Amino acid sequence: MTGRDGLSDARSRSRALAPGCPPTGSRLRSFAINDLLGLEADLPTPAEPGLRSNSGDPAEAIGSGPGPGPGLCGSCPARGALPLGLGLLCGFGAQPPSAAAAARARCLLLADLRLLPSAGPEPAVAQGPVHPPPALGSQQRSESVSTSDGDSPSEEKNDPKMSLILGKRKKRRHRTVFTAHQLEELEKAFGEAHYPDVYAREMLAAKTELPEDRIQVWFQNRRAKWRKREKRWGGSSVMAEYGLYGAMVRHCIPLPDSVLNSADSLQGSCAPWLLGMHKKSTGMRKPESEDKLAGLWEFDHLKKGANKDEDGPERGPDETTQNPENSLEDVAIDLSSSSRQETKKMPPGSSTQLPQPPQVGAS
């Protein structure tokens, strides 16, 4: 049962108790909301003594009746223009009027006027703008703040920059799986040089069919593994030489004298692998350099001999007679390869029987 039903029941009881009110069993004239709720009152007759008193204040009408019946019953016809709670005042008709009853009726009337709106024209106070209580306003502000905070993650997700950053974080490169042949070639190259140059990396890439950047990363990881193992074994001096060697390879710095001086005693050196790599590199470079130097020396001497052959007829007779040793050297240089072989086959004592070059100036 709601509050309106309770008020309607109380109103019906008050009508039954009041002598001037219409009976409760009367039939409703229409199905309007006022008739269903009992808000519409019967029209007053001029014979009723409380008609004039209803024109004034309802509270005055309640206390102005001569007796309990007419004074209180006069308020029943005025219920159509007053709020719903005024029907309860009819229950006081059986009691004699007193100051306490009048004050109580006035309080009930004022409470009904404040809480329940009337069916007639609204008062001027209700026509003004209705402001919500501060508690509701603060609650609405807190809800708006919470909704804005709750929408912020969705805005960040919708932001293209944030989505790109999340995509970059989630993107991971797959690990490269090396075959046995590739690992064998890489380990062999690592045994030769821990810091391969660009040419060595390109050769490894051609052999193993791996990209050069993957080879470089493999060497970085392999050096880190080697350093970890050397630290575990306590090779601090080896680590120092290793770091120095890496700096030298990067900046093309020659080996220090301490390492070069310990090349004779390989077993007592602090970095035997470094000396081994140094000897291997020098051993690979030395034959090539010697062959190049020998070829250049022969080419230069042959060129000088050809120039001397061209300048031979112009020289005077005194040059060969004054310097016989120089003349023999010139002749030996100017001879062809066949004449050289013949001179090698001749005994050492017959070197003085070499043919003399013709003296052009003597004739």
UniProtKB/Swiss-Prot annotation:
Annotated GO MF terms: DNA-binding transcription factor activity, RNA polymerase II-specific; sequence-specific double-stranded DNA binding
Keywords: Developmental protein, DNA-binding, Homeobox, Nucleus, Sensory transduction, Transcription, Transcription regulation, Vision
Family, per entry: Belongs to the paired homeobox family.
Function in brief: Binds to the 37-bp core of the locus control region (LCR) of the red/green visual pigment gene cluster. May regulate the activity of the LCR and the cone opsin genes at earlier stages of development. Dispensable in early retinal development.
One Gene Ontology term from the biological process aspect of the record: visual perception
Source organism (scientific name): Mus musculus
Domain CVC: 231-283
Protein name listed in UniProt: Visual system homeobox 1
Principal place of residence: nucleus
SUPFAM superfamilies hit by this protein: Homeodomain-like
Residues covered by region (Disordered): 1-25, 42-66, 122-166, 300-363
DNA-binding region(s) from the entry: 171-230
